[in-house]
């Protein structure tokens, strides 16, 4: 049992040179780059609070769980232990599961599910089973992650097909762009390590951490906005960016502008 907590007990080893900057930290840059989770998560919790207060305070669980993703990511890259790997991957699964249960469109629920509470219980049950199964067969977590992610992407594509709001479409394209950049860094670090070692630039996985947090901020706000437009249209949800709404780069969030019943085309 102690072996799963041992340094470098994981089969995964990223491109960054081990113990290059510290004798106690296996992957220093990958560990330090995980700090971005602790910067962005509290800001998003604050920015999305008006929406969460009106819609469901459970929305905060997404970004609270992202803090745990950051903690476990730091632990994993600091030790490259098998337990660190499992905690890192499972925390990501729980972020997806929480978002899935909160924001999956009601109109796409299976016929045997009558309300969101029942849907959330179903998702919770599947996630718990996947979590427990992962400690027996680690690939179970990968299957669950892919199932949630693919279904979320498909549902989002269906929702955006009928959307004509330019600000929403801009946010969608920004989310896709950040996600593509993040995945490209992950794949390149994982499978193109020899090339980056020749250039003495083995930090793409750390850059992935930064990009995926930003992609999550953009994508979760997009999904939350579509949800607000359907579930609480009377609140007149609108998109803005922090710290300045007219800046080219910022963190997107939802503002609620009114109480009259109305709805945009999204």
Swiss-Prot record:
**Cofactor dependence:** Zn(2+)
Cysteines engaged in disulfide bonds, as pairs: none
Name one process (GO BP) from the record.
Answer: sphingosine biosynthetic process
Report the EC number(s), separated by commas if there are several. 3.5.1.-, 3.5.1.23
Q: Which residues cross the membrane?
A: 28-48, 57-77, 84-104, 117-136, 140-160, 168-188, 206-226
Per UniProt, where does Zn(2+) bind? 77, 205, 209
| Pathway(s) it belongs to | Lipid metabolism; sphingolipid metabolism
- Asked whether the keyword Transmembrane helix is assigned, the reply is yes
Record topological domains on the Lumenal side: 1-27, 78-83, 137-139, 189-205
Cellular component (GO) terms are: endoplasmic reticulum; endoplasmic reticulum membrane
InterPro entries the UniProt entry points to: ACER
Q: How does it sit in the membrane?
A: Multi-pass membrane protein
| Topology Cytoplasmic: residue spans | 49-56, 105-116, 161-167, 227-266
Which transformation does this protein catalyse, written as a reaction?
A: an N-acylsphing-4-enine + H2O = sphing-4-enine + a fatty acid; N-tetracosanoyl-sphing-4-enine + H2O = tetracosanoate + sphing-4-enine; an N-acylsphinganine + H2O = sphinganine + a fatty acid; N-(9Z-octadecenoyl)-sphing-4-enine + H2O = sphing-4-enine + (9Z)-octadecenoate
Q: Which cell locations does it reside in?
A: Endoplasmic reticulum membrane
| Swiss-Prot/TrEMBL keywords | Calcium, Endoplasmic reticulum, Hydrolase, Lipid metabolism, Membrane, Metal-binding, Sphingolipid metabolism, Transmembrane, Transmembrane helix, Zinc
What top-tier enzyme class does this entry carry?
Answer: hydrolase
Which superkingdom is the protein from? Eukaryota
Record Pfam families: Ceramidase
**What function does this protein fulfil?**
Endoplasmic reticulum ceramidase that catalyzes the hydrolysis of ceramides into sphingosine and free fatty acids at alkaline pH. Ceramides, sphingosine, and its phosphorylated form sphingosine-1-phosphate are bioactive lipids that mediate cellular signaling pathways regulating several biological processes including cell proliferation, apoptosis and differentiation. May also hydrolyze dihydroceramides to produce dihydrosphingosine.
Q: Which family does it belong to?
A: Belongs to the alkaline ceramidase family.
- Give the PANTHER family listed for this entry: ALKALINE CERAMIDASE (PTHR46139), ALKALINE CERAMIDASE 1 (PTHR46139:SF2)
What is the protein's name according to its record?
Answer: Alkaline ceramidase 1
Can you name the source organism?
Danio rerio (Zebrafish)
